[in-house]
Amino acid sequence: MFRLDLLSDPLEQFKLWYDEAIRHETLHPDAMVLATADSKGKPSARNVLYKGISKGGFLIFTNYHSRKAHELDENPQAAWVFYWPKTYKQVRGEGRVERLTQEESEAYFETRSYESQIAAWVSEQSQEIPDREYLITRYKKYREKFQDDVRCPEFWGGFRLIPDRMEFWVGQEHRLHDRFCYLKENQEWKIIRLAP
């Protein structure tokens, strides 16, 4: 891969690679590892689902009572990684994080399937529960409560991950991989090549 192969905007470059991963029938191309840290710097990571790009950032949605949400509120910086084995490509991002507005979260919530909307009410994410039956009971309760329209819970919504650094990696023979890094400087993106 050559520098001239890259677009000047890393978000647009990401979209190209993401679409390529979809065309190659990658299993869960929208899965990304999100790394956060609490106010003391203790890190944690987990897979989340990427839900699009808006206003210069990657969108994710979660329960605001979850560990990730607490950490993003305490320390609004994050790192994230997409890896697509079928195309042998990886994209890394780092940057600041902001909560979406209630209106943005509700607009996305309305696009979710009925079952996913119910699940948002059911899961007390990251909290200890007694057993699986507890979840099933809650699921039945909320299906009964919301038989038609499911409103967006106040404790559920999105975050925008706004990168100031992004890295695009392509695996090559003999471990001579291609790595290009986009760095945001004075509101402009600078692109440099990194050693593998």
Swiss-Prot record:
One of its GO terms (molecular function) is FMN binding. NCBIfam families: pdxH, PRK05679.1. The keyword Cell inner membrane does not apply. The keyword Flavoprotein applies. Its EC number is 1.4.3.5. Homodimer. PANTHER family: PYRIDOXINE-5'-PHOSPHATE OXIDASE (PTHR10851:SF0), PYRIDOXINE-5-PHOSPHATE OXIDASE (PTHR10851). Catalyzes the oxidation of either pyridoxine 5'-phosphate (PNP) or pyridoxamine 5'-phosphate (PMP) into pyridoxal 5'-phosphate (PLP). Pathway: Cofactor metabolism; pyridoxal 5'-phosphate salvage; pyridoxal 5'-phosphate from pyridoxamine 5'-phosphate: step 1/1; Cofactor metabolism; pyridoxal 5'-phosphate salvage; pyridoxal 5'-phosphate from pyridoxine 5'-phosphate: step 1/1. It catalyses: pyridoxamine 5'-phosphate + O2 + H2O = pyridoxal 5'-phosphate + H2O2 + NH4(+); pyridoxine 5'-phosphate + O2 = pyridoxal 5'-phosphate + H2O2. Keywords: Flavoprotein, FMN, Oxidoreductase, Pyridoxine biosynthesis. InterPro entries: Pyridox_Oxase, Pyridox_Oxase_CS, Pyridox_Oxase_N, Pyridoxamine_oxidase_dimer_C, Split_barrel_FMN-bd. HAMAP family: PdxH. Binds 1 FMN per subunit. One of its GO terms (biological process) is pyridoxine biosynthetic process. It is an enzyme of class 1 (oxidoreductase). FMN binds at residues 46-51, 61-62, 67-68, 90, 125-126, 169, 179. This is Pyridoxine/pyridoxamine 5'-phosphate oxidase. It comes from the Bacteria. Disulfide bonds: none annotated. Its cofactor is FMN. Belongs to the pyridoxamine 5'-phosphate oxidase family. Gene3D superfamilies: Electron Transport, Fmn-binding Protein, Chain A. Substrate binds at K51, Y108, R112, S116, R175, L176, H177.
